[in-house]
Swiss-Prot record:
CDD domains: WW (cd00201). This is Pre-mRNA-processing factor 40 homolog B. PROSITE patterns: FF (PS51676), WW_DOMAIN_1 (PS01159), WW_DOMAIN_2 (PS50020). The keyword Repeat applies. The lineage of its organism: Eukaryota, Metazoa, Chordata, Craniata, Vertebrata. One of its GO terms (molecular function) is RNA binding. It comes from Homo sapiens (Human). PANTHER family: PRE-MRNA-PROCESSING FACTOR 40 HOMOLOG B, PRE-MRNA-PROCESSING PROTEIN PRP40. Residues 171-277, 690-871 are annotated as: Disordered. Belongs to the PRPF40 family. The modification N6-acetyllysine is found at residue 148. The gene is PRPF40B. May be involved in pre-mRNA splicing. InterPro entries: FF_domain (IPR002713), FF_domain_sf (IPR036517), Prp40-like (IPR039726), WW_dom (IPR001202), WW_dom_sf (IPR036020). There is a cross-link at residues 175, 838 (Glycyl lysine isopeptide (Lys-Gly) (interchain with G-Cter in SUMO2)).
Length: 871
């Protein structure tokens, strides 16, 4: 069973372009599979025996008188053995190992009858010497995806597009060998061929060339075939002799063949052909050689070919006419193709002529072109219809060409104008278009360039605009660089002035307590201060303030350091401590080198204030202890048994109190005498007050005073109240006019009246004083808090010690009490004396219901003063 010859051999060469990579093994592309039920040509059906030519000892049947074609015989022999092949009539040809076949797509493949394999590549046993050398060459040809051939070297792994010289030399050898074979086979073309066409034999492998030496026996009764056989026997013998002589004798027979062809035709009249097809082909060649046209009649053709010996190739007239008609049909097709090619060539010639002619443009009319080129042969040879098509194509080509040329010219002009503008120093970012035009006309490069002068105005304006924008960008960049330089210089000036302030601080001229007015004379003489003047941003004064604020911000940290130094040194700041001693103690410590002088001074002031506060607190405590001692001494005098009298002398009673602790606590004798005298004065005042109280009681026994109810809004008292005694009443004063007393509200009188009644009828003056003092304290509490907060906000320290806070609070209380006393003393002379009571027939005048607490306090103090005066 034969393998399907239409299947491709394994392996397909990659169509990679040369990139330095070795390609895969080369193989032809796969053959498309055949439809089912269809076998490739020249192959038997599946299961059928192979052709007779492939069966050893079998010869295909031939017509009588036919010459058996040469059959290639190739046998695989052992190494060193010679391969011999000869075919003799009557002896069967040897079995062929390789046979050549044609695939459905026209490609040739080879089949091995022994191992039943088919390959695309020609076996080495069938190759000639040149083909073997070509197959052994390391360079192989491949094709890329685009179909372009490239070459790859299997040994050096190199790929290239150009064809190597080795391949060219080998192909020249192959062509020379093929030409030698054609010269060897040339005598065979002179002999008649068998009537049945046979496929061309495959290429002869290296070794002896097979020679056809046998003929088939003619059939009985075939006289014509016998004549042909007898005529071809001399030619066959000559051809065999030529093959036996080898390639060296082929060159000697070629001149003889040329001489035979150059002989007159009557000498070739004895030629005959082996089959009818060859004879018919010879008759057609005769008609072609005589250039018989396709529209010639049989009679015209006979006149042209009847004298040629090949006219008798077909013995029958019907066969001649049949061959003539076939020739006419074929010739007609050829003439049409020739006419089409001539017309195509004429159109191409006309198109090329019009495209290259200088008078042709894309705007030229067809009539104008016809008038210009109508007399030329290149124009007239093309038909009108084809000429217009060609003309339209030419116009399209010229329009495209002119457009491309215009683009190139525009690009060139723009580039030239840019170069000229770049080289003109007189053009800046403020130059106008009219000025630039004048500058361009004065420029020699622009004046000598005619194409540049014919440049489109819009393109020139666009080019100029781009140039101006580029100059503006450069100018803006230059300005930005200048601004950056200026800012950098200003920053350097500020840094230099900051360094100058650091120098002043290091020398001690600048500290946290420095002021600009004090430091200005030293600062204004420095050049770094002068460089700062006039520049935007922070001024020298701002930098000075910032510097001082930074020093002040370091106060608390430096204060802690100073306290640590004093603690380590065992030094304490007292009220009488001098700053020089304080600074002298601190200067011995290394930590004092980084301290600010102003902060040192502030710390000293703070510590000094604390010392003063402690001293004041100590004095206050001493005063409180003294007051307690004095109170104890007075209590001792008051509790003396028997009680002391007004006329008693201190020397008389001193011995009675010597052993008492209160007596011993008062160390000074003068203080004891003073306290004793004060006690006697109080005792005297008490006695006087007691006498006045008794007199008032006896004077009111027989009298009844009826008081009408008060008409004031606050009249919640009883209908009848006792008036104060005459000794406690204020002195009567002249009644004022309403105009004189308009500034004083009448409601105050009612409040004062109620206060006076309370003094006379409900209790002692001391109880009312205590109540007034209590109300006054309540009213003054918010003010004290406000003052405290204000005082805290003004203090240099945000955080103080508890002892310092207590001392400050006590100081503030004393200061507030002193201020109240001074205010009361200042208001006493300006106040209206007495109650200022307006009496009516019905009772006290209470026109106003409210008085301020301050007014009530002042009036209360006035009443107390008057009471003291009466006593």
């Amino acid at each position: 069973m034969m393998p399907p010859p239409f299947m491709p051999p394994p392996g397909i060469p990659p169509p990679f372009p040369p990139m330095g990579l070795p390609p895969m093994s080369q193989r032809p592309p796969a053959i498309p599979p055949m439809p089912p039920g269809i076998l490739p040509p020249m192959l038997p059906p599946m299961g059928a025996p192979p052709p007779l030519t492939q069966i050893p000892g079998m010869v295909p049947p031939m017509m009588p008188g036919m010459l058996m074609p040469a059959v290639p015989v190739t046998a695989a022999t052992a190494p060193g053995a010679d391969t011999a092949s000869s075919a003799v009539a009557g002896t069967g040809p040897p079995r062929a190992l390789w046979s050549e076949h044609v695939a459905p797509d026209g490609r040739i493949y080879y089949y091995n009858a022994d191992d039943k394999q088919s390959v695309w590549e020609k076996p080495s046993v069938l190759k000639s010497k040149a083909e073997l050398l070509l197959s052994q060459c390391p360079w192989k040809e491949y094709k890329s995806d685009t179909g372009k051939p490239y070459y790859y070297n299997n040994q050096s792994k190199e790929s290239r597009w150009t064809r190597p010289k080795d391949l060219d030399d080998l192909e020249v050898l192959v062509k020379q060998e093929a030409a030698g074979k054609q010269q060897q086979q040339l005598p065979q073309t002179l002999q008649p061929q068998p009537p049945q066409p046979q496929p061309d034999p495959p290429p002869v492998p290296p070794g002896p060339t097979p020679v056809p030496t046998g003929l088939l026996e003619p059939e009985p009764g075939g006289s014509e075939d016998c004549d042909v056989l007898e005529a071809t026997q001399p030619l066959e013998q000559g051809f065999l002799q030529q093959l036996e002589e080898g390639p060296s004798s082929s060159g000697q027979h070629q001149p003889q063949q040329e001489e035979e062809e150059s002989k007159p035709e009557p000498e070739r009249s004895g030629l005959s052909w082996s089959n009818r097809e060859k004879a018919k082909q010879a008759f057609k060649e005769l008609l072609r050689d005589k250039a018989v046209p396709s529209n010639a009649s049989w009679e015209q053709a006979m006149k042209m070919v009847v004298t040629d010996p090949r006219y008798s190739a077909l013995p029958k007239l019907s066969e001649k006419k049949q061959a003539f008609n076939a020739y006419k049909a074929q010739r007609e097709k050829e003439e049409k193709e020739e006419a089409r090619l001539r017309a195509k060539e004429a159109k191409q010639t006309l198109q090329h002529f019009l495209e290259q002619h200088e008078r042709m443009t894309s705007t030229t009319r067809y009539r104008r072109a016809e008038q210009t080129f109508g007399e030329l042969e290149v124009w007239a040879v093309v038909p009108e219809r084809d000429r217009k098509e060609v003309y339209d194509d030419v116009l399209f080509f010229l329009a495209k060409k002119e457009k491309e040329q215009a683009k190139q010219l525009r690009r060139r002009n723009i580039q030239a104008l840019k170069s000229i503008l770049d080289g003109m120093s007189s053009v800046n970012f403020q130059t106008t278009w009219s000025q630039a035009q004048q500058y361009l006309m004065d420029n020699p490069s622009f004046a000598q360039d005619h194409q540049l002068q014919n440049m489109d105005k819009e393109d020139a304006l666009i080019c100029f605009e781009e140039h101006i924008r580029a100059l503006e960008r450069e100018e803006e960049e230059e300005r930005e660089r200048a601004r950056l330089r200026e800012r950098r210089q200003q920053r350097k000036n500020r840094e230099a002035f900051q360094t100058f302030l650091d120098e002043l601080h290091e020398t001690g001229q600048l500290h946290s307590m420095s002021t600009w007015m004090e430091l200005y004379p030293a600062v204004s003489t420095d050049v770094r201060f002068a460089n700062m003047l006039g520049q935007p941003g922070s001024t020298p004064l701002d930098l000075f303030k910032f510097y001082v604020e930074e020093l002040k911000a370091r106060f608390h940290d430096e204060k802690k350091i100073i306290k640590d130094i004093l603690k380590d040194r065992g030094f304490c700041v007292e009220v009488n401590t001098a700053f020089e001693d304080f600074a002298h103690v601190i200067s011995f410590d290394k930590r004092a080198a980084a301290l600010d002088a102003g902060n040192i001074k502030l710390t000293f002031n703070s510590l000094l204030e604390k010392a003063e506060a402690r001293e004041r607190e100590r004095e206050k405590e001493e005063a409180r202890r003294m007051r307690r001692r004095e109170a104890a001494f007075r209590s001792m005098l008051r509790q003396a048994v028997p009680a002391l009298e007004l006329g008693t002398a201190w020397e008389e009673v001193r011995e009675r109190f010597v052993c008492d602790s209160a007596f011993e606590q008062i160390t000074l004798e003068s203080e004891r005498i003073r306290l004793f005298r004060e006690f006697l004065q109080v005792l005297e005042q008490t006695e006087c007050q007691h006498l006045h109280t008794k007199g008032r009681k006896h004077g009111r026994k027989g009298k009844k005073h009826h008081h009408k109810r008060s008409h004031s809004p606050s009249g919640s008292e009883s209908e009848e109240e006792e008036l104060p005694p005459p000794s406690l009443r204020p002195p009567k004063r002249r009644r004022r006019n309403p105009s004189e007393s308009g500034s004083e509200p009448s409601s105050s009188l009612d409040s004062v009246e109620s206060g006076g009644a309370a003094l006379g009828g409900r209790g002692s003056p001391s109880s009312h004083l205590l109540g007034a003092d209590h109300g006054l304290r309540k009213a003054k509490k918010p003010k004290k808090k406000t003052k405290k907060r204000r005082h805290k906000s003004n203090s240099p320290e945000s955080e103080t010690d508890p002892e310092e806070k207590a001392g400050k609070e006590s100081d503030e209380k004393e200061q507030e009490q002193d201020k109240d006393r001074e205010l009361q003393q200042a208001e006493l002379p300006n106040r209206s004396p007495g109650f200022g009571i307006k009496k009516e027939k019905t009772g006290w005048d209470t026109s106003e219901s409210e008085l301020s607490e301050g007014e009530l306090e002042r009036r209360r103090r006035t009443l107390l003063q008057q009471l003291d005066d009466h006593q």
